[in-house]
A protein has these predicted regions:
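A short, histidine- and acid-enriched strand-loop-helix "catalytic/donor-clamping" loop
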Residues: 105-111
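Conserved N-terminal subdomain of the carbohydrate kinase-like
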Residues: 1-74
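Short secondary-structure boundary segments
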Residues: 14-16, 74, 105, 135-136, ...
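Anion (oxyanion) recognition and catalysis
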Residues: 3, 92-96, 125
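Charged helix-capping and loop-helix junction motifs
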Residues: 58, 84-89, 114-122
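Hydrophobic beta-strand scaffold residues
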Residues: 9, 101-102, 132
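Short beta-strand/loop segments at the ligand-binding rim of alpha/beta enzyme cores
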Residues: 97-105
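Conserved phosphate/ATP/ADP-binding segment of small-molecule kinases
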Residues: 97, 111-189
Length: 189
């Protein structure tokens, strides 16, 4: 489909994927909003091929060694424990191979809890070069004493640019591997 629409997609691995004949393709359904009714997305991924696939059969080094950049989304690890394992292995392998790694937390409340997302995504940070968004990540003021709170505690949902700069600097201080942080800014009217 990409090539037929003149989307440049080289290099994309086009070899035959592993087959999982007993599992279906995951999907999602978008109910487009109208007027004051917001759009709604329903994920149908439980027991889908990706959630049941044995990722230990993949040679990640062989798969990634020809690339310079790996982008991962926080949606994949939200799908199932094996997907979390795959995401972490991809991060570690990419770091080992010297790839630039970008990561977008993409929190989806219908796929996992806020705390699950924060705990897992925070574990990803030491392997990330380009971070998209500042949530969902823990940024404890004191790594030993979490009762002192998160740097982001008390910051409004739509922080000012000055507050964002303070948070971004705290991330860079804590994770010097981060070369770039970008935050999504979206306003609903």
């Amino acid at each position: 489909m990409l090539r037929s629409n003149d989307v440049h997609c080289t290099p994309v691995i086009l070899s035959t994927p592993e087959q999982t004949p007993t599992h279906r393709l995951g999907s999602y359904y978008l109910e487009t909003g109208y007027g004051i009714r917001a759009s709604k997305v329903t994920y149908d991924r439980k027991n889908s091929a990706i959630t049941e696939f044995d990722f230990d059969t993949i040679d990640l080094k062989g798969l990634l060694e020809h690339f310079t950049w790996l982008h991962l989304s926080g949606i994949t690890p939200a799908l199932a424990p094996n997907c979390r394992k795959l995401t972490m292995e991809c991060l570690k392998t990419a770091r080992e191979l010297g790839l630039t790694v970008s990561f977008d937390g993409n929190f989806r409340s219908t796929l996992w809890t806020w705390e699950e997302a924060r705990d897992f995504c925070t574990q990803c940070l030491p392997y990330v070069d380009v971070l998209l968004g500042i949530e969902p990540y823990h940024l404890w003021r004191d790594e030993e004493d979490h009762s002192k709170g998160d740097v982001k505690d008390g910051i409004p949902f739509q922080p000012s640019y000055e507050q964002q700069d303070e948070i971004f600097q705290a991330f860079i201080d804590r994770y010097p591997n981060l070369r770039c942080i970008a935050r999504h800014v979206r306003y609903a009217h």
